C-alpha cells in the first residue's frame, strides 16, 4: 500500500523572519501516524498548535498566515508547506520560536534539503488522498481558480504581469506533480516583489527581513538581483510553488487538476475551503498497490536535489 510518511530524525535550522527581520529557529519533529501536519509556536506559554487546516488560514495579505482566535499567528508557512507536499510528508510537528517561518532563500529548496537531512520514515498506515469528483471554481474579479477531476495531481497556472523583465511566453506553466519533478522544476523558484513595494512596506515596519538574498526584486524595467533568474519562468514557477503549499493546507495530497489565472494565497485558500465544504465534490481514497498510485512520491532514501 501507499503508506504515510514522517521524518526519521529531528532537524533544526535558523533563518531570518521575512516580516520581523529577526532570527528564527525552526525545528522539524517526527510525528505518529494520523497526527497530520502541526505548526507550533514554542515562544508562547503554553505553546500554541495550529493543525494544517484551510480554516486556520486567516490572513493572506503578503503570505499565508495561520491565526487562532486569540490572535496568535504563524506567518509565511507556504514554502515549507510546499516542501512537505513535495516530499509526501503526512505527519510532522513544525516548531518555531517566532511568529513566522524563516524565509531562507525565498524558495522551498532549503526546506527540501532539511527534510532530506532528516530522512523519511514510512509508517504502516495507508496514506489518505483527497480525490476531486466534480469541478469546483472560485472567482474574484478577473482572477479565478478551479479544481476538476483528473487521475493525478496537475497544475495549470497562468500569471499576467505586464513587465519588460517577465517574458509573455513565460507566464503559464503546466506541471504534472511528482516528488522528483517538484524538487527539480519547482522547489528552487524564489518569491518576487517590486522595489517600490518593498520600500513602502519597510517604511510601515513590514518585510524587514526582505533582501536580495531571499527574493527576486524588480524595478519598473528590470531585475535588480545581480545573479538574475534561476530559470526563465521563475515567476510563474514560484506561483505554482505557492499554490502547492496553499493547497496542502488540507494536510493530504489531492488527486485532481488545479487550474488558475492570476490566483494568489487568498484565492487558493477560498477554493480549497469551497471544495472541502461540498461533500459531493471530493472523497477519501487510499491505494493498496504502489503501482496504482496516480501521484509519484519519492522513495524514502532517494536523493533528489
From Swiss-Prot:
Cofactors that this protein relies on: Zn(2+)
Binding site for Zn(2+): 79, 238, 242
Pathway: Glycolipid biosynthesis; lipid IV(A) biosynthesis; lipid IV(A) from (3R)-3-hydroxytetradecanoyl-[acyl-carrier-protein] and UDP-N-acetyl-alpha-D-glucosamine: step 2/6
Top-level EC class as recorded in UniProt: hydrolase
Transmembrane segments: none
Catalytic activity: a UDP-3-O-[(3R)-3-hydroxyacyl]-N-acetyl-alpha-D-glucosamine + H2O = a UDP-3-O-[(3R)-3-hydroxyacyl]-alpha-D-glucosamine + acetate
GO BP terms in the entry: lipid A biosynthetic process
Record key words, sorted: Hydrolase, Lipid A biosynthesis, Lipid biosynthesis, Lipid metabolism, Metal-binding, Zinc
Signal peptide segment: none
Any one GO CC term of the record: membrane
EC number: 3.5.1.108
Keyword Lipid biosynthesis: yes
Family classification: Belongs to the LpxC family.
Functional summary from the UniProt entry: Catalyzes the hydrolysis of UDP-3-O-myristoyl-N-acetylglucosamine to form UDP-3-O-myristoylglucosamine and acetate, the committed step in lipid A biosynthesis.
PANTHER family: UDP-3-O-ACYL-N-ACETYLGLUCOSAMINE DEACETYLASE 1, MITOCHONDRIAL-RELATED (PTHR33694:SF1)
Protein name: UDP-3-O-acyl-N-acetylglucosamine deacetylase
Organism: Vibrio parahaemolyticus serotype O3:K6 (strain RIMD 2210633)
Lineage of producing organism: Bacteria, Pseudomonadati, Pseudomonadota, Gammaproteobacteria, Vibrionales
Gene name, Swiss-Prot/TrEMBL: lpxC
Amino acid at each position: 500500500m501507499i503508506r504515510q510518511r514522517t521524518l526519521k530524525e529531528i532537524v533544526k535550522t535558523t533563518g531570518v523572519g521575512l516580516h520581523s527581520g529577526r532570527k528564527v529557529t525552526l525545528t522539524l519533529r517526527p510525528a505518529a501516524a494520523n497526527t497530520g501536519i502541526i505548526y507550533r509556536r514554542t515562544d508562547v506559554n503554553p505553546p500554541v498548535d495550529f493543525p494544517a487546516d484551510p480554516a486556520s488560514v486567516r490572513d493572506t495579505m503578503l503570505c499565508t498566515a495561520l491565526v487562532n482566535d486569540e490572535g496568535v499567528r504563524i506567518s509565511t508557512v507556504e514554502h515549507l508547506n510546499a516542501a512537505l507536499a513535495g516530499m509526501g510528508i503526512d505527519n510532522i510537528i513544525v516548531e518555531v520560536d517566532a511568529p513566522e517561518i524563516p524565509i531562507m532563500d525565498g524558495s522551498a529548496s532549503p526546506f527540501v534539503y532539511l527534510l532530506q537531512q532528516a530522512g523519511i520514515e514510512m509508517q504502516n498506515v495507508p496514506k489518505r488522498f483527497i480525490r476531486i469528483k466534480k469541478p469546483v471554481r472560485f472567482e474574484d474579479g478577473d482572477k479565478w481558480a478551479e479544481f476538476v477531476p483528473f487521475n493525478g495531481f496537475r497544475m495549470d497556472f497562468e500569471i499576467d504581469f505586464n513587465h519588460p523583465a517577465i517574458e509573455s511566453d513565460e507566464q503559464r506553466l503546466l506541471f504534472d506533480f511528482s516528488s522528483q519533478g517538484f524538487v527539480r522544476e519547482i522547489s528552487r523558484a524564489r518569491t518576487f516583489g517590486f522595489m517600490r513595494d518593498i520600500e513602502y512596506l519597510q517604511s510601515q515596519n513590514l518585510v524587514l527581513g526582505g533582501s536580495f538574498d531571499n527574493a527576486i526584486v524588480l524595478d519598473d524595467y528590470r531585475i535588480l538581483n545581480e545573479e538574475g533568474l534561476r530559470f526563465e519562468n521563475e515567476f510563474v514557477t514560484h506561483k505554482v510553488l505557492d499554490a502547492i503549499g496553499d493547497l496542502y493546507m488540507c494536510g493530504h495530497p489531492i488527486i485532481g487538476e488545479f487550474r488558475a489565472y492570476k490566483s494568489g494565497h487568498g484565492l487558493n485558500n477560498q477554493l480549497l475551503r469551497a471544495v472541502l465544504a461540498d461533500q459531493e465534490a471530493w472523497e477519501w481514497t487510499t491505494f493498496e498497490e504502489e503501482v496504482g498510485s496516480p501521484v509519484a512520491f519519492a522513495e524514502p532514501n532517494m536523493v533528489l536535489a
